[in-house]
């Protein structure tokens, strides 16, 4: 039969390691005399109410009465002599338990007196106790200073006083200070009782003076705050003036832009931080797009007769013009300028309006020049923009050449 080795738990292994460090070996018992247990207690699954290490078969295997009889018999010695038989004990150990009777003072009623026909009859024990108390007074446990002096025969912790060195001068000085302090207190009380009315008048005057001082301090603080506010407003006003000047210079610089930006109706955008500035910039972009589309439809040309789109230029070959057509174009240009100015009036300041008036005049001049060029379209000849490039014939001439080739 093969014996299965015991599987030791982690706790058992740790306990064995600790015991081995201290010189224990397997098979030895615990304790100084090595008479303790040799095997560790093992806890199994409990399904009863018994405690740990309980042996249910102990009551059948442990014969305690026989052990007790043998122990008492061994302790007794029987001596037989002339006078008879004597029993003697070897040890003073008692085989019986000494059951001490508990005191019943706080468990039951204590009898102190008996009542006989409505009269109290005290016990003799109490009377004897009272007589003893009257004869010998019990000294207190905590002694007073006087009792300590008597017991120590007038000695104190000041060892120099035993030789004769005392602090009479210091004690006299302290007593004089205390008397002077008490005299001052008594004098102040007497003055307070004798003159209650005279003290009330100066107290009212003091209150008035305090109020006046507080009012003066409040006035001075208000003045200082007012001066600080004025200085702050002056500085902010100066800063705003400087900012306005800078903005004005920027707007004038943008207004004197290139001719192409003027043709497209470009104006220097005023950098505004509010929501109105954002709305005005959006409106300007829409107007520029419209203006560009109208110029492309009308075939706007610049001062030199060059088309804005960069295509071939038309040169006037005759003096014939259409007055009705030119007047109509001028009206449309003027209406566009008026609508732009009316929409911008609400969002602009006085300084910006002046700048816009200058721009309006320049636009009007440019429109008049463009219209003068566009009215001369009856007899035109098509040429290249640059002199070095090849001249292009009129589209009608091209059509005639194609017909000739086909014939």
UniProtKB/Swiss-Prot annotation:
Residue span(s) of domain G-patch: 11-57
Bias (Polar residues): 191-201
Compositionally biased residues, Basic residues: 238-248, 282-291, 351-364, 393-407
Compositionally biased intervals (Acidic residues): 334-346
UniProt keyword annotations, A-Z: Acetylation, Isopeptide bond, Phosphoprotein, Ubl conjugation
Positions bearing Phosphoserine: 128, 130, 258
InterPro entries, A to Z: G_patch_dom, PINX1
One Pfam assignment: G-patch
Annotated spans, Disordered: 116-138, 187-407
GO molecular function, one term: nucleic acid binding
Cross-link (Glycyl lysine isopeptide (Lys-Gly) (interchain with G-Cter in SUMO2)): 46
Cellular-component GO terms for this entry: nucleolus; nucleoplasm
Modification type N-acetylmethionine: residues: 1
Start-end of Basic and acidic residues biased regions: 118-138, 224-237, 374-392
Disulfide bonds: none
Record GO biological process: hematopoietic progenitor cell differentiation
PANTHER family, sorted: G PATCH DOMAIN CONTAINING PROTEIN (PTHR23149), G PATCH DOMAIN-CONTAINING PROTEIN 4 (PTHR23149:SF9)
Entry protein name: G patch domain-containing protein 4
Source organism (scientific name): Rattus norvegicus
Gene name of the encoded protein: Gpatch4
């Amino acid at each position: 039969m093969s014996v299965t080795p015991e599987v030791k738990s982690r706790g058992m292994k740790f306990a064995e390691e600790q015991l081995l460090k201290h010189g224990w070996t397997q098979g030895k018992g615990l304790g100084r005399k090595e008479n303790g247990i040799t095997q560790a207690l093992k806890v199994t699954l409990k399904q009863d109410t018994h405690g740990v290490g309980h042996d249910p078969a102990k009551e059948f295997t442990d014969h305690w009465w026989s052990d007790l009889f043998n122990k008492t018999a061994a302790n007794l010695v029987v001596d037989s002599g002339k006078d008879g038989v004597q029993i003697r004990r070897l040890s003073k150990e008692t085989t019986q338990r000494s059951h001490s009777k508990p005191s019943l003072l706080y468990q039951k009623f204590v009898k102190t007196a008996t009542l006989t026909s409505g009269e109290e009859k005290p016990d003799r024990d109490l009377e004897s106790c009272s007589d003893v108390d009257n004869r010998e007074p019990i000294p207190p446990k905590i002694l007073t200073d006087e009792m300590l002096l008597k017991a120590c025969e007038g000695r104190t912790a000041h060892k120099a006083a035993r030789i004769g060195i005392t602090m009479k001068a210091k004690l006299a000085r302290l007593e004089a200070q205390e008397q002077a302090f008490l005299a001052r207190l008594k004098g102040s009380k007497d003055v307070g009782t004798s003159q209650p009315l005279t003290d009330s008048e100066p107290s009212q005057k003091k209150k008035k003076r305090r109020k006046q001082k507080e009012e003066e301090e409040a006035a001075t603080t208000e003045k200082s705050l007012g001066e600080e506010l004025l200085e702050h407003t002056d500085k902010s006003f100066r800063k705003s003036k400087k900012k306005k000047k800078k903005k004005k210079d920027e707007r004038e610089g943008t207004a004197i832009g290139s001719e192409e930006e003027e043709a497209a109706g470009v104006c220097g955008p005023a950098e505004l931080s509010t929501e109105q500035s954002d709305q005005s910039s959006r409106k300007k972009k829409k107007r520029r797009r419209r203006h560009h589309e109208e110029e492309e439809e009308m075939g706007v040309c610049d001062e030199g007769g060059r088309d804005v789109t960069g295509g071939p230029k038309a040169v006037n070959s005759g003096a014939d013009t259409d007055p009705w057509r030119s007047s109509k174009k001028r009206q449309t240009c003027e209406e566009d300028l008026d609508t732009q100015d009316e929409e911008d009036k609400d969002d602009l300041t006085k300084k910006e309006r002046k700048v816009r008036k200058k721009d309006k005049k320049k636009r009007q001049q440019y429109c008049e020049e463009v219209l003068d060029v566009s009215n001369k379209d009856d007899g035109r000849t098509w040429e290249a923009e640059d002199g070095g490039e090849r001249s292009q014939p009129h589209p009608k001439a091209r059509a005639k050449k194609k017909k000739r080739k086909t014939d």
